[in-house]
Amino acid sequence: MVKKFKNVFMIVADSMGIGKDQKQESFGDNGANTFLHVWQNYDLQIPNLKKLGIEALVSLKDKNEDLKPQAYVGKIFAKSNAKDTLAGHWEMMGIQTKVANPNFIEKGFPDELIKELEKAFDGRKIIGNENASGTEILKRLAHREIENNEIIVYTSPDSTLQICGHEEHMGLENLYRYAKAARQICSSKSIWNVARVIARPYVGQNGSYTRTFNRHDYANKPSETLLNSLQKAKIQTIAVGKINDIFVGQAIDKVYPPASDVENMDVAIEIAKTKKENQFVFVNLVEFDSHYGHRRDVIGYGKNIDSFDKKLGELLEVLSDDDLLIITADHGNDPTFPGSSHTREALPLIVYSKAFKNPSYLKTLLGLGTSGNIVARNFGLKTIETGEDIWDKLK
């Protein structure tokens, strides 16, 4: 058994799936493999991920048994009956999603819900109400929202209700107010209870519009998670990126709001440099999913992996023997796959510390809570039921 670490960093490469899992066919995603298909279409430059052992999980070449990974690496199969951000992150912290939240991709949101939303949106007429790409719907409808004081509402293959608002014409505060009201309305009936209401601010004019990083997610409030246990044990919980929104601020001590993946990695690097103790740093890198997976931009996805690998190298340099790093993912989103939605896939688990003596390949593991259990055991807490306990294998 390895020693206890003073700090644990968990980085979620949002949507970085690694191929088939036990439920892939039932989700209609047979053949999806996000990382492999990106690698087949883009010449990845990833010396740090290779050093840690990514090629044991997915590679263009036959597995090389002579590879000596510097981290423990394994594949995880999710337990939850879902393939979305909320289900993935919640499972990491101890909550299994057995029944997926409703989605509205076939017919849009029902008239009764639309009427309730329009009342809450100061009488603005809702336009859109369809399954759409966020960037595409702005091209079609943003001018109407601005000129007529209407409001774009749309959904995605995930369980979401997304609301657009121009930062100048509508104003961020109004957009956030509408999104909070929509969360309350959706939560009032089980048939409307989407996993997330998302405020999608944008800027621009004359047909040229860009979404900004002032996005906010309003999720259902989870029951108590491992984060609560950490907080009660006086371990500082630090949320970087979307993490605070995903857990509705519950049991989060310090928040670094969503930014680019590079900027979120920079936050992790700066935290590591402080050499403080008793910290759990939970990082989400959303651009893999939002900018490249959903948009089916395989080259962009590859470039983002390269950028992540470069920042990963900087992080590895500043981590000490007293730090533990976990890299994983919440679901897949294969940019070569038909459609624009998430893909059900196996997910990576990479566990690294300079203190490890002889890291090795792990067997396939059941439950994203496996990563959470590493955190729990490190800080002397009770394990969670949504994953396996591999702590005693880390040496």
Curated annotation (Swiss-Prot):
<dbReference type="GO" id="GO:0008973">
    <property type="term" value="F:phosphopentomutase activity"/>
</dbReference>
<dbReference type="InterPro" id="IPR024052">
    <property type="entry name" value="Phosphopentomutase_DeoB_cap_sf"/>
</dbReference>
<feature type="binding site">
    <location>
        <position position="14"/>
    </location>
    <ligand>
        <name>Mn(2+) 1</name>
    </ligand>
</feature>
<feature type="binding site">
    <location>
        <position position="330"/>
    </location>
    <ligand>
        <name>Mn(2+) 1</name>
    </ligand>
</feature>
<comment type="similarity">
    <text>Belongs to the phosphopentomutase family.</text>
</comment>
<feature type="binding site">
    <location>
        <position position="294"/>
    </location>
    <ligand>
        <name>Mn(2+) 2</name>
    </ligand>
</feature>
<dbReference type="GO" id="GO:0006018">
    <property type="term" value="P:2-deoxyribose 1-phosphate catabolic process"/>
</dbReference>
<keyword id="KW-0479">Metal-binding</keyword>
<dbReference type="GO" id="GO:0009117">
    <property type="term" value="P:nucleotide metabolic process"/>
</dbReference>
<comment type="pathway">
    <text>Carbohydrate degradation; 2-deoxy-D-ribose 1-phosphate degradation; D-glyceraldehyde 3-phosphate and acetaldehyde from 2-deoxy-alpha-D-ribose 1-phosphate: step 1/2.</text>
</comment>
<protein>
    <recommendedName>
        <fullName>Phosphopentomutase</fullName>
        <ecNumber>5.4.2.7</ecNumber>
    </recommendedName>
</protein>
<feature type="binding site">
    <location>
        <position position="289"/>
    </location>
    <ligand>
        <name>Mn(2+) 2</name>
    </ligand>
</feature>
<dbReference type="GO" id="GO:0030145">
    <property type="term" value="F:manganese ion binding"/>
</dbReference>
<feature type="binding site">
    <location>
        <position position="331"/>
    </location>
    <ligand>
        <name>Mn(2+) 1</name>
    </ligand>
</feature>
<comment type="function">
    <text>Isomerase that catalyzes the conversion of deoxy-ribose 1-phosphate (dRib-1-P) and ribose 1-phosphate (Rib-1-P) to deoxy-ribose 5-phosphate (dRib-5-P) and ribose 5-phosphate (Rib-5-P), respectively.</text>
</comment>
<dbReference type="GO" id="GO:0005829">
    <property type="term" value="C:cytosol"/>
</dbReference>
<keyword id="KW-0464">Manganese</keyword>
<keyword id="KW-0963">Cytoplasm</keyword>
<keyword id="KW-0413">Isomerase</keyword>
<dbReference type="InterPro" id="IPR017850">
    <property type="entry name" value="Alkaline_phosphatase_core_sf"/>
</dbReference>
<dbReference type="GO" id="GO:0000287">
    <property type="term" value="F:magnesium ion binding"/>
</dbReference>
<dbReference type="GO" id="GO:0006015">
    <property type="term" value="P:5-phosphoribose 1-diphosphate biosynthetic process"/>
</dbReference>
<feature type="binding site">
    <location>
        <position position="342"/>
    </location>
    <ligand>
        <name>Mn(2+) 2</name>
    </ligand>
</feature>
<dbReference type="InterPro" id="IPR010045">
    <property type="entry name" value="DeoB"/>
</dbReference>
<dbReference type="InterPro" id="IPR006124">
    <property type="entry name" value="Metalloenzyme"/>
</dbReference>
<dbReference type="GO" id="GO:0043094">
    <property type="term" value="P:metabolic compound salvage"/>
</dbReference>
<dbReference type="Pfam" id="PF01676">
    <property type="entry name" value="Metalloenzyme"/>
</dbReference>
